[in-house]
């Protein structure tokens, strides 16, 4: 399935790397989120993870990620039970865009609120990590999600020195 019809060589290298933890120090607008969405949809369709927890620096980036995921869902003709916005914690105003597959797996796209990751498990994707309001707190909240061996992905452009 992975070929140069859909991906550039550096994107294929990212997909072929099966490491549990991957960090992508990247440039802007190179299709990193696009290729990550492909990996995440495949992981859910194939039940390699129970859930994907994706966080980007702002809500528009989370929406763009979900749009990419929707494209891959249609491409694979995957059966989806629900998709839309859900409230994770109304007291803390934490919402997520969610795609729920028929097999029970889910993709969640959240804003950069670190509290959104508390008590969650599964694959974690931190997009534009260096641009989150509080990357240290986000890391502390997200890291335990991978305790049971699920993957962690960090993708980011630079935001000054010592930002990654």
Where are these regions (language model features)?
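Phosphate/NTP-binding elements of NTP-utilizing enzymes
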Residues: 1-164
């Amino acid at each position: 399935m992975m070929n140069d019809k859909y991906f550039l060589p550096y994107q294929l290298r990212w997909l072929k790397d099966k490491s549990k933890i991957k960090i992508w120090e990247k440039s802007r607008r190179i299709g990193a989120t696009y290729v990550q969405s492909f990996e995440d949809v495949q992981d859910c369709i194939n039940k390699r993870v129970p859930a994907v927890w994706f966080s980007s620096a702002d809500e528009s980036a989370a929406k763009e990620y979900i749009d990419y995921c929707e494209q891959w869902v249609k491409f694979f003709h995957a059966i989806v039970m629900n998709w839309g916005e859900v409230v994770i914690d109304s007291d803390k105003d934490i919402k997520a865009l969610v795609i729920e597959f028929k097999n029970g797996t889910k993709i969640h796209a959240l804003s950069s609120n670190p509290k959104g990751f508390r008590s969650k498990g599964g694959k974690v994707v931190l997009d534009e990590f260096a641009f989150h309001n509080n990357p240290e707190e986000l890391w502390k909240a997200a890291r335990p999600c991978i305790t049971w061996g699920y993957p962690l992905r960090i993708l980011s452009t630079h935001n000054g020195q010592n930002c990654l």
